[in-house]
Structures are given as C-alpha cells and as structure tokens.
C-alpha cells in the first residue's frame, strides 16, 4: 500500500477512490480505515484515537500501515524524511522501537507486530530471570496483557512451555515441561510440573493464555531461570584468614582491629568458556572480582540472615569475565555481620568466611570446577570495620591507602608473599539468596559546605538518607580525614557513624563506604587542609532493587507531600541486607512502629 504525503487534496482523492473511512484529516495527522486496516500519516509526533478502543502514538514524522491479524497487529512503517534511523510507536500504550534498515536512504520501511493479548512480567519465584533457584519445583507467575481494553477481560486457561534451550523454546517445544491446556484463571505461583531439574541447569520458558472468548493470546516473550546448588552439590570448603578478633578484654567489648580480608585463586583455561557460573556464600558481606573486574553491580551482598544457622549464597554468571590462559577469582570480604554477637556459633570464630564454587563448561566439552579450599591465598585489605557491629557501635570504616596493593585482583599479581587461607568447619545451612539485591539507586548531591570552625567543615547533603558517602580527597602522606555523620544539624555523630580515610604516598584518593553504610544528612569533616568543593562530594541512596508497583497523586499538595515522605522513609528504612531506621539504630526492624512518631 502506498499512502501519498504531499497534500490534503491528494489524501482526500486517494481515500475516496479506495472507499476508505476517514478517521482524521488535518495538517497534523491523516488517517483512514478499511475493514481492519488503517493507514496513518503523522506529519508531526503525536497521538491519534483510531476508534474502537485503539490509540496510536509516535515520536517522529512517519507513515504507518496497521492491519489486525488474529490477536495482534501487523505494522509497516515508512520514513517520509528518508533519513530517520528509528521510530517509537505506542499502540494503546504498549511501546515498540522500530529500526529502519541501515544504508537505505530512500523509502526505507520496517515491519513489526504487536499482540493485542500477550502475557508479560514473567517471574520465577517472584524474580525476573533469576540465577540460583534452589527449589526443585519452582513457582512461575505472569500478568495478562492486552492492548485493547474492555470490560470482563479474563484468563480462562493457560499453557506453559519449559525447554532446555532457547532454540527449542522458539520452536514451541517444551522438552522439560509442556503443561498443555490448563483450564484455570490462576497466573501466580504455578508449580513447575516437568522432568526433575538438576543443579546449575538452565530453563527457558514462555506462557500463553486463553481469554473469555476462548481465544489464545500470543506467546509471551521468553524468560529463563538457572537452578542453584543444593546441599549435596557443594564440593567447596569454608575458608577465612587466620587473623582472629579479640572481641573482649577483661569482659568488656573492644573495637574491631581485624582488617577485611582479600582472597584469590588463580587457574588456567585452555579454551574459551561456553558457560560459566560461580556460587559465593559468605558470613559477612562480599565483593566478587574476576580478572580484575567486579562482577555485577550489587552492593552489601548477600542478604542478612541469622548466621547461627544459615548463610546465603549469590549466583553470578562469569562467562564474559573469563579468558584463555591464566585467570583469577578474587574475593573481598567484609567483617560486618560475621562479628555480630547474636549471630555467633561456639564452634566458629567471629571472622568473615566464604564458600565458593565455580562451574565452567569449555567449548571443547571439558568441564572445570574451582572450589574454595586451603590452596587459596589471603591478605589483609586496606579496609577495617570500626566499632564492633552492635547497636550504637556500628560506627563505620577506616580505609588506609598506605596498605593498598595495586592489581591484587588481577591474574599477573605476585601473591607469593600472601598467606594460605584457612579451612573452617561450620554447620550452617547454605541456601540461595532469592531476593532483589541492594544497589546504588539514587545519587544525592550536596547543597552546601560550611566551615563551622577553623579546619572543620560541615556538608549538608540536603536530605536524610541511608546509604554511602563518597568524596574525592587531597592530602599529604599520613594525613587522616575523619567523617562524622548525623541526622540532625546540631547533633554530631548521634549514632556514632564515623569513617576515616588515611593517606598513603599518593596525595589524591577517594573515600567511599564499602561494607558499612551511614544514615543522616549532615557530614562533619576534619583533617582537610582545604575547603572541599561541592562537585567533589556525592551520596548514594541504597535499597533493594524492587520495582514500584503503584503510585499516588492527587490535587492536594499536602497529601502528595505525605505520600512522597512516606515512600522515601520506606525506601531508606527497609533493606534486605540490613534494617535501618534513621534516628533509631541500624539493627531495629520495627520501622512500621516508629514511622508514625
């Protein structure tokens, strides 16, 4: 079909000869309809109501041909400007990006399809495409999506396909499970009913549903999950450093002096990996590095649990981090919850520990397993917990730049002077960390820096928040910079949140929290030889990466402010890796009781 785009008169003549129904005819958009076919010329970005509950929007000048096909719409798009690279269309709010073929400058066209009925937001155990599912029969969920709204729309049946490969799934073959037609309106926590699954197995799945008129929807976009390890699958051993903390002297608590430890293990690969996954459990927080690169963007992992009886493991896909030749897996452990008094075991020292197992499948067909044991190397890092991780004594971190060792997590680093890791025994239950991780989800910029007394500066971050504080620093070797955090302007370090940065030989450095966090709005800084600039400072609000499922807005500003304040309070107060009630204490988990006060 060719739609003229030169003049209104040509458009009228065209529609008249073709017996089209004119929907709109203006200098902004022209649209006609014949049966279930639509032709639309957008002279400017905009939206048009095509009738029968159908709206179409575009962000560019474009020609669109729309035809209903079964439960979907075929869409052809032409570029009247001969130079556009892509266009974003939205059919009843469902957006699709359409890219024009590269290299074609005249009359370039593109095609896509938007289904009127299609499941979306597929989840396995409440997560999207999760890694490390340690449930033999995972539960699957989805939502019913429709581009055309109508009363009484509902699901009357569903069919789930689960395959061992994406190719099989694309061919509509569920070799692991084909549920067949199940007459049910249920779409939440449908228990997997296929062949038994094994540790580390990848599962690809999709679903479709039947509506109130017994019409099948389109298949959902594919989703996947990877199985985790079960108790019998672990071949690794718990490791830690030999350094012990003296938690009390003469029956009194003393501050921690044990550095957060580093661990590393080198190994060789003769071939590129076809698949590679690593499971890391830790008592205390951890950061994982492979060949010098931090794996993932999660922070303060894994989730908090009672280490008297349990430890959580994280699952990481490390295929893209490995190479042929020498590789290294490196860990940075945070003391944190490992020394929390209520989580201690009599048969386990109060030190951070890790349990690591990597499963690597090479392109040659060979399999490689790397496990934590006494062949790993360990060394103290520059980071040390301040306080002793108990109510009113969480304090902060001390980073001593003089103890840095560049490249400690790279393959070529000389670790001959490092100690061997020590193997420990503990009877904690190891289970997967099946929740959204903590992430840096909001950058906070300071409002002002004030010199409150000679050499003492107070930073106003503009809002009370829970998260990290980051600052670019300059100083002389041996200088110590002290940061004291407070929720109230005139109350210094009310909850004893104190961090320290010590300069080494380098005269520049960056302080940022790593295995602890702060709460507050005001930061008092001592030890600097200059007044800091605002662009040298920033904060990070940290929370679990949950998706917001709703919102609130009305025409009363007071109610909108109450909603925003309540939402912010919730976001900074309920974490999967810690409980933080600003103005109370880190470990309190009774936020709902305190928020109304």
What is the predicted function of each stretch?
Residues 589-597:
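Well-ordered alpha-helical segments within folded domains of soluble proteins
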Residues 1:
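Hydrophobic, well-ordered secondary-structure elements that form the walls
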Residues 4-115:
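Non-catalytic terminal regions with compositionally biased, polar/charged low complexity
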Residues 117-202, 206-584, 589:
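Extracellular/oxidizing-compartment recognition motifs
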């Amino acid at each position: 079909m060719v739609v003229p785009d030169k003049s209104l008169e040509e458009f009228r003549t065209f529609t008249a000869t073709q017996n089209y129904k004119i929907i709109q005819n203006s200098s902004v958009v022209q649209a006609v309809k014949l049966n279930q076919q639509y032709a639309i010329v957008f002279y400017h970005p905009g939206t048009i109501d095509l009738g029968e509950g159908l709206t179409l929007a575009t962000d560019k000048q474009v020609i669109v041909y729309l035809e209903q096909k079964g439960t979907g719409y075929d869409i052809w798009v032409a570029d009247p400007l001969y130079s556009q690279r892509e266009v974003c269309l939205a059919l009843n709010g469902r957006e699709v990006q359409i890219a024009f073929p590269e290299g074609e400058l005249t009359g370039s066209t593109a095609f896509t399809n938007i289904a009127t009925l299609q499941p979306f937001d597929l989840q396995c155990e409440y997560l999207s495409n999760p890694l490390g599912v340690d449930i033999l029969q995972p539960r699957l969920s989805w939502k019913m999506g429709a581009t055309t709204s109508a009363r009484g729309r509902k699901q009357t049946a569903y069919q789930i396909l689960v395959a061992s490969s994406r190719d099989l799934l694309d061919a509509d073959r569920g070799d692991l499970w084909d549920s067949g037609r199940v007459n049910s309106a249920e779409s939440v926590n449908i228990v997997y009913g296929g062949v038994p699954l094994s540790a580390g197995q990848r599962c690809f799945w999709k679903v479709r549903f039947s509506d109130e008129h017994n019409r099948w929807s389109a298949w959902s976009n594919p989703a996947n999950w990877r199985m985790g390890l079960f108790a019998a699958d672990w071949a690794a051993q718990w490791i830690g450093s030999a350094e012990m903390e003296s938690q009390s002297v003469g029956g009194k608590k003393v501050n921690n002096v044990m550095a957060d430890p580093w661990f590393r293990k080198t190994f060789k690969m003769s071939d590129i990996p076809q698949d590679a996954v690593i499971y890391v459990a830790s008592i205390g927080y951890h950061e994982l590095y492979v060949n010098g690169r931090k794996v993932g963007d999660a922070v303060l992992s894994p989730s908090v649990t009672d280490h008297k009886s349990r430890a959580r493991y994280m699952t990481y896909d490390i295929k893209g981090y490995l190479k042929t030749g020498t590789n290294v897996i490196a860990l940075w452990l945070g003391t944190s919850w490992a020394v929390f008094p209520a989580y201690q075991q009599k048969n386990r020292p109060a030190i951070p520990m890790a349990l690591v197992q990597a499963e690597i499948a090479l392109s040659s067909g060979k399999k490689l397993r790397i496990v934590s044991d006494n062949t790993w190397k360990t060394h103290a890092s520059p980071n040390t917990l301040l306080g002793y991780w108990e109510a009113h004594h969480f304090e902060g971190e001390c980073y001593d730049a003089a103890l840095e060792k560049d490249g400690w997590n790279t393959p070529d680093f000389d670790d001959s002077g490092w100690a061997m890791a020590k193997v420990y025994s503990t009877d904690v239950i190891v289970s997967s960390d099946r929740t959204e991780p903590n992430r840096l989800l909001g950058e906070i910029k300071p409002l002002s820096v004030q010199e409150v007394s000679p050499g003492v500066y107070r930073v106003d971050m503009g809002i009370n928040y829970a998260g990290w504080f980051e600052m670019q620093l300059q100083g002389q070797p041996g200088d110590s910079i002290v940061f004291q955090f407070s929720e109230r302007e005139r109350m210094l370090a009310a909850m004893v949140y104190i961090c320290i940065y010590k300069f080494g030989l380098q005269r520049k450095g960056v302080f940022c929290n790593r295995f602890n966090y702060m709460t507050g709005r005001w930061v008092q800084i001592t030890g600097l030889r200059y007044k800091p600039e605002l662009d040298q400072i920033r904060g990070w609000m940290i929370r679990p990466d949950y998706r917001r499922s709703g919102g609130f807005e009305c025409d009363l500003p007071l109610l909108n402010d109450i909603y925003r304040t309540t939402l912010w309070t919730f976001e900074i107060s309920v974490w999967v890796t810690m409980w933080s009630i600003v103005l109370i204490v880190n470990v309190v988990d009774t936020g709902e009781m305190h928020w109304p006060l």
